[in-house]
UniProtKB/Swiss-Prot annotation:
Induction: During nodulation in legume roots after Rhizobium infection, and after release of bacteria from the infection thread. Residues 144-162 have a biased composition (Pro residues). One of its GO terms (cellular component) is plasma membrane. It comes from Glycine max. Residues 27-132 form the Phytocyanin domain. May act as a carbohydrate transporter. Disulfide bonds join 85-120. This is Early nodulin-55-2. Keywords: Disulfide bond, Glycoprotein, Membrane, Nodulation, Signal.
Amino acid sequence: MASCLPNASPFLVMLAMCLLISTSEAEKYVVGGSEKSWKFPLSKPDSLSHWANSHRFKIGDTLIFKYEKRTESVHEGNETDYEGCNTVGKYHIVFNGGNTKVMLTKPGFRHFISGNQSHCQMGLKLAVLVISSNKTKKNLLSPSPSPSPPPSSLLSPSPSPLPNNQGVTSSSGAGFIGVMMWLMLLL
């Protein structure tokens, strides 16, 4: 029996590493699902709200805002500034580089608006709900509260669901897991 322990230990370490990697995958989301989606005019005033509601954002995920830096910017602020499209909020973080990457580091709502107030008022704003990455699968499958859509969305029908992975890139550990499984077979 004692001779089994040395062989079991590497197996358990590799199994633990595989489980850790598969549960800690972070996603990168291009806001709006495509290049230059952070621009005005939008295809529909509530298109960014619908896009955000079709995804589950977790701690560690990254939002990528792609926009024309000469004409647009991204402001991160609070809910009040988001609702009122206040572009001069006291606690705003302003991004204006054209390719802004924002890592989601804690659970809760994050609010982003255009630096151009009239663009924001026409729907160029985004609220996302970030969930803790240690939620159970049951919690991930249950509906979550959604950010307040612009008033025009109350009158328009809901669009059909977006296809999976629209605007999403995964930093998957699938290749690493395959290598680890191959190594386990060699042992």
